[in-house]
C-alpha cells in the first residue's frame, strides 16, 4: 500500500495550555474545520470530542492525551492536503507527566494562552518541558472576545516570563466584544470570518485605517525576524527593504524549527475566529518529521545509532501511552519514527528484549477508531495485542534492534492508603491498581510492610482522587482512602569518617565474617546515592565489594530518623577485612548495612520535606487574608504581580504538608473568589520542630 500523504506534508503537533485557556475548545475547532466532526462539541456542555473519559467531561478538564488524525488544505482550500496528527495534552499541574510524555513524541507544539490570564504557572512548566525536548512551537492567544483581553500584554509576558521570542504574524482587530478578526501581516489584509458558517468561510478586506500604522510596524518586526534566518535574506532585505511572502515564510519557518522564534497568532476558538489561520501557520512554520534530526538510540553493540524518518529505513517506534479501552482492551499509543509495519507483523520490544505480535492497528479520532492495515514513518497510531509494552518502550524490527532514549518520569510526592470496602473488592482492587500503574508511570502502588496496607502515590491530591474515581468507574471497585501522607526524605548535613561495620557469627561449624569501613558525606542535591570503591591492597576481595554496596542500598530505603528513604549521600568504602573461610557475600552485605546505619547517625541526619510552588490569584480585598494564611502555613512569599482587570497574583513556596485541604480554606477566606495552582518545586530541610513532630508520629 503506498503512502497517502508524503511525509513532508505531515505535522505531528501537541496542543498545550494552562487549564482554562480554552485548549479543548481550540482542538474541537481544529477537528471541525478539518472536517472530522461536523457538530462542534462544547466543553460547557461536557460534550467535547477530545475529552473522552467521563470524569474529564464532568470536571471540564482534559486528563488523557488522546491522539487524533486530521487533514487540512489551508484556510482557502488551495494548498496540498496535509496530515495533522494532534496530541491533546492536559493543562492541569497534576498531569504534567502526560505533557512530558507527549512532548517526547511531538515534532511541534501549539501553545494556547488566554488573552486575559496570559502566562500562568503551568504555562511555565510546559514551556520548560518543550525546551527540554527542543520542540518548535507557535503561540495562539485565545479568548480575544473576553473582557480584559489584551494581545500585546500577553506578548510582553511571553518575553518576560518565558524568555520567549514571539513574532506576531497576525494582529487583532479590536478586542473584547469588539474583536472582529485579525490582520494577516504576511498579506497585509484584514481577515473577517463569516459567523453564519461558523467560520468556515472568510473574506480578505482592507486594513481598518486606524490600524494601518501599527500594522506596518509589526510587519517590519516580522520581516526583520525572517531576514535574520540567513545571510542571503538579510542582504536582500538591507538592499531592497522588503522580502517576498515566500521568503518571509521560509525565514520564519527555519527560525521556528531552530527554536529561535515563536510565531504568534490570536483569535477566539469559542466564537470561531482565528483557529483557521492558526492551522495555516502550523503548515507554514512547524516541522514535518524530516525537518528535524533523526531519532537516536542504542544499538545491540552498545553504540549510538540513528533512524531516519523514511519508509525504506528499518522500523522503529516509541510507545508513549497506554489506555484501557472498554471495547478492545489495552491500547498502546505509539509514534513511528522510521520504516513501515503491518498489522500481524512480529516486532521486537527492544527495551524488554521480547518479541510480540502486533495485532490490530487503530487510527484514533478522539474516542472513535478506524482500523488500518499499516503505519509508516511519521504516523501516530494505537496497537491492540501488545502484552508487555509499557510507556517509554521501543518497538522495532527484530532484525535490526535499537533502543530509543527512555523517558524519565518524576518521583511521586504524595501517598495515601487505600482499602477495599468489601471482600470481593479486594481482588479486583489489586488488578485495577496494577492496570492504572501500567498506564501512568507517575503513579506507584506498594504494600506497607508494617501495616499491610496498600499505599498509592502520585503527583498531587487531584491525581490520586481521579485514579480512585477511575477504579470505581472502570473496574467497579469501591475503596476508602486514608489521609494523604507526604513523601518525606532523609539525608545528612555532616561527614562521618572511618565508621566500622562488622558482622561476625561464630557458633560452631561455618561462621560468617564481613568487615567494612566507610566514610559518609553529603552529595549534591538531586545527585542521589553514590558509592566509591577506594579499597587498596585487597583488604576486601573484589567479589565482595558489590555486596557491601548492595547492603547499603537496601538500608537507604529506610533512614535512621523516621524510616524515610535516604537521598543525596556519598559513600567511600575505604577499608575492611575478611576471613578465608567464613567470609561470604551475605556477611559483607550485613557489614555494609551496619556501617551505613552507624555512619548516618553520626553525620547529622535531617528530614527533607517537599516544597511546592504555589500561585494564588485573588481580588485585592482578600490579599491580607491570603498572605497571612500562607505565612501561617510556613509559606515564604516570593513575589506579587498585578492581574489584568484588578486582583493580585501571589507567588509563594509552601511545604506540601501544610497544603492539604487548601482549596476549601481558600474558598472560605475569599468567598470563593480566589483560585490557586500548585506544583512540586524541590526538597528542603524541615525545621527542627516539624522534624521532631514527624519522628514522634512515626514512632507511635
Swiss-Prot record:
Q: Which GO terms describe its molecular function?
A: GTP binding; GTPase activity; guanosine tetraphosphate binding; translation elongation factor activity
Gene Ontology annotations of biological process type: ribosome disassembly
Which InterPro entries does this one have?
EFG_II, EFG_III, EFG_III/V, EFG_IV, EFG_V, EFG_V-like, EFTu-like_2, G_TR_CS
| tr-type G domain segment(s) | 8-290
**Gene3D superfamilies referenced in this protein's UniProt entry, alphabetically:** 3.30.230.10, 3.30.70.240, Elongation Factor G (Translational Gtpase), domain 3, P-loop containing nucleotide triphosphate hydrolases, Translation factors
Where does the protein principally reside?
Answer: cytoplasm
Annotated residues for binding of GTP: 17-24, 88-92, 142-145
Which cell locations does it reside in?
Cytoplasm
Keyword annotations for this protein?
A: Cytoplasm, Elongation factor, GTP-binding, Nucleotide-binding, Protein biosynthesis
Pfam families, alphabetized: EFG_C, EFG_III, EFG_IV, GTP_EFTU, GTP_EFTU_D2
Keyword match rRNA-binding? no
| Any one Gene Ontology cellular component term annotated for this protein | cytoplasm
> What family is it from?
Belongs to the TRAFAC class translation factor GTPase superfamily. Classic translation factor GTPase family. EF-G/EF-2 subfamily.
Q: What does this protein do?
A: Catalyzes the GTP-dependent ribosomal translocation step during translation elongation. During this step, the ribosome changes from the pre-translocational (PRE) to the post-translocational (POST) state as the newly formed A-site-bound peptidyl-tRNA and P-site-bound deacylated tRNA move to the P and E sites, respectively. Catalyzes the coordinated movement of the two tRNA molecules, the mRNA and conformational changes in the ribosome.
The name this protein carries in UniProt is Elongation factor G 2
Q: Source species, please? A: Paraburkholderia xenovorans (strain LB400)
Amino acid at each position: 500500500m503506498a503512502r497517502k500523504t508524503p511525509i513532508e506534508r505531515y505535522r505531528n503537533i501537541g496542543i498545550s495550555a494552562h487549564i482554562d485557556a480554552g485548549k479543548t475548545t481550540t482542538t474541537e475547532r481544529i477537528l471541525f474545520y478539518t472536517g472530522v466532526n461536523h457538530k462542534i462539541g462544547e466543553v460547557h456542555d461536557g460534550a467535547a470530542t477530545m475529552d473522552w473519559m467521563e470524569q474529564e467531561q464532568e470536571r471540564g478538564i482534559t486528563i488523557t492525551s488522546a491522539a487524533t488524525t486530521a487533514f487540512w488544505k489551508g484556510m482557502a482550500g488551495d494548498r496540498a492536503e496535509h496530515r495533522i496528527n494532534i496530541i491533546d495534552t492536559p493543562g492541569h499541574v497534576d498531569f504534567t507527566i502526560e505533557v512530558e510524555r507527549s512532548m517526547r513524541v511531538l515534532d511541534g507544539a501549539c501553545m494556547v494562552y488566554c488573552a486575559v490570564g496570559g502566562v500562568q504557572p503551568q504555562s511555565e512548566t510546559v514551556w520548560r518541558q518543550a525546551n527540554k525536548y527542543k520542540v518548535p512551537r507557535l503561540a495562539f492567544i485565545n479568548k480575544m472576545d473576553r473582557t480584559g483581553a489584551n494581545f500585546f500584554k500577553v506578548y510582553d509576558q511571553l518575553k518576560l516570563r518565558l524568555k520567549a521570542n514571539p513574532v506576531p504574524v497576525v494582529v487583532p482587530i479590536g478586542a473584547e466584544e469588539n474583536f472582529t478578526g485579525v490582520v494577516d501581516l504576511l498579506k497585509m489584509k484584514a481577515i473577517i470570518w463569516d459567523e453564519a458558517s461558523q467560520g468556515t468561510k472568510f473574506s480578505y478586506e482592507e486594513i481598518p485605517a486606524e490600524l494601518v500604522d501599527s500594522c506596518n510596524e509589526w510587519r517590519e518586526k516580522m520581516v526583520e525576524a525572517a531576514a535574520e534566518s540567513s545571510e542571503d535574506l538579510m542582504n536582500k532585505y538591507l538592499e531592497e527593504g522588503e522580502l517576498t511572502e515566500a521568503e518571509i515564510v521560509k525565514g520564519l519557518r527555519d527560525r521556528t524549527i531552530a527554536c529561535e522564534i515563536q510565531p504568534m497568532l490570536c483569535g477566539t476558538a469559542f466564537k470561531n475566529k482565528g483557529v483557521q489561520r492558526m492551522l495555516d501557520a502550523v503548515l507554514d512554520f512547524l516541522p514535518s518529521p524530516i525537518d528535524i534530526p533523526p531519532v537516536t538510540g542504542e544499538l545491540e553493540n552498545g553504540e549510538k545509532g540513528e533512524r531516519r524518518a523514511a519508509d525504506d529505513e528499518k522500523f522503529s517506534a516509541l510507545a508513549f501511552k497506554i489506555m484501557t479501552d472498554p471495547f478492545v482492551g489495552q491500547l498502546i499509543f505509539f509514534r513511528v519514527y522510521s520504516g513501515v509495519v503491518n498489522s500481524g507483523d512480529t516486532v521486537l520490544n527492544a527495551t524488554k528484549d521480547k518479541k510480540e505480535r502486533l495485532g490490530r492497528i487503530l487510527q484514533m479520532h478522539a474516542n472513535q477508531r478506524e482500523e488500518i492495515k499499516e503505519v509508516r514513518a511519521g504516523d501516530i497510531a494505537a496497537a491492540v495485542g501488545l502484552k508487555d509494552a509499557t510507556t517509554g518502550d521501543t518497538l522495532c524490527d527484530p532484525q535490526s534492534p535499537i533502543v530509543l532514549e527512555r523517558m524519565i518520569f518524576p518521583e511521586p510526592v504524595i501517598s495515601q492508603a487505600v482499602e477495599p470496602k468489601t471482600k470481593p473488592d479486594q481482588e479486583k482492587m489489586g488488578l485495577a491498581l496494577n492496570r492504572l500503574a501500567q498506564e501512568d508511570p507517575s503513579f506507584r502502588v506498594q504494600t506497607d510492610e508494617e501495616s499491610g496496607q496498600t499505599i498509592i502515590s502520585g503527583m498531587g491530591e487531584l491525581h490520586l482522587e481521579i485514579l480512585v474515581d477511575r477504579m470505581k468507574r472502570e473496574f467497579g471497585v469501591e475503596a476508602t482512602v486514608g489521609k494523604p501522607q507526604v513523601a518525606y526524605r532523609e539525608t545528612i548535613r555532616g561527614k562521618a569518617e572511618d565508621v566500622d561495620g562488622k558482622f561476625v557469627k561464630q557458633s560452631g561449624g561455618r561462621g560468617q565474617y564481613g568487615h567494612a569501613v566507610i566514610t559518609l558525606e553529603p552529595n549534591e542535591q538531586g545527585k542521589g546515592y553514590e558509592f566509591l570503591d577506594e579499597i587498596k591492597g585487597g583488604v576486601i576481595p573484589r567479589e565482595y565489594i558489590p555486596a557491601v554496596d548492595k547492603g547499603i542500598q537496601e538500608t537507604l530505603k529506610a533512614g535512621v530518623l523516621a524510616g524515610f528513604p535516604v537521598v543525596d549521600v556519598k559513600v567511600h568504602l575505604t577499608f575492611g577485612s575478611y576471613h578465608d573461610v567464613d567470609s561470604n557475600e551475605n556477611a559483607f552485605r550485613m557489614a555494609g548495612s551496619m556501617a551505613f546505619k552507624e555512619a548516618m547517625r553520626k553525620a547529622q541526619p535531617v528530614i527533607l520535606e517537599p516544597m511546592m510552588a504555589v500561585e494564588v490569584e485573588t481580588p485585592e480585598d482578600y490579599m491580607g487574608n491570603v498572605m497571612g494564611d500562607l505565612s501561617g502555613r510556613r509559606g515564604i512569599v516570593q513575589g506579587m504581580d498585578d492581574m489584568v482587570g484588578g486582583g493580585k497574583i501571589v507567588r509563594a513556596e509552601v511545604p506540601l504538608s501544610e497544603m492539604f485541604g487548601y482549596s476549601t480554606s481558600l474558598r472560605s477566606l475569599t468567598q470563593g473568589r480566589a483560585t490557586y495552582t500548585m506544583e512540586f518545586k524541590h526538597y528542603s530541610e524541615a525545621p527542627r520542630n516539624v522534624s521532631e513532630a514527624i519522628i514522634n508520629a512515626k514512632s507511635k
